[in-house]
């Protein structure tokens, strides 16, 4: 136990100046152990001529051939999280598209004050119902080929679900953070 604690102390001492002076990147991969469950087919029962062209699968758990899990959200909960100066106050809109009767991407990240452009590339109308806790909820009806933009003024403690009330199988998530 002592050699382990000694090594840990040296590691922390060496890492501390780097953490204080420099920026870093943390990369990781979430994987599933064993065989992943098969994605279930979604019941497409509205606008079938458009939404039923492709077999739509649930995106609740998306696992790659290597066992990697997609759409995992990891963030720091702290009042004083520093952000790299190049990333502060992001102004370019983040896009979430209604495409092939599903939301793309399935998970989006937006900074407080950064626009979220809800787009509809389909030939049928959709709505994007964003169920936030700290921001006023939005429920935009978006005609085929149109878009709507929303800007959140407060951070959200958890990802907000995005749904289409017209096509109930459509679900996605947006995380609004200050950093």
What residues fall within each predicted segment?
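Sec/Tat signal peptide C-region and signal peptidase I cleavage site
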Residues: 14-20
């Amino acid at each position: 136990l002592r050699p382990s604690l000694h090594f840990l102390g040296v590691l922390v001492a060496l890492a501390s100046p780097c953490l204080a002076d420099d920026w870093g990147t943390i990369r990781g991969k979430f994987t599933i152990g064993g065989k992943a469950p098969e994605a279930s087919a979604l019941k497409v029962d509205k606008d079938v001529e458009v939404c039923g062209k492709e077999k739509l699968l649930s995106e609740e758990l998306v696992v790659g051939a290597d066992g990697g899990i997609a759409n995992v959200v990891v963030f720091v909960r702290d009042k004083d999280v520093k952000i790299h100066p190049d990333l502060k106050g992001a102004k370019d809109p983040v896009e979430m598209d209604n495409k092939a009767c599903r939301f793309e991407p399935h998970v989006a990240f937006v900074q407080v004050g950064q626009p979220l452009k809800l787009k509809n590339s389909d030939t049928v109308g959709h709505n994007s119902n964003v169920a936030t806790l700290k921001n006023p909820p939005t429920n935009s009806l978006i005609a085929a080929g149109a878009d709507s933009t929303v800007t959140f003024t407060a951070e959200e403690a958890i990802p907000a679900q995005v749904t289409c009330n017209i096509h109930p199988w459509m679900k996605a998530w947006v995380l609004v953070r200050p950093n």
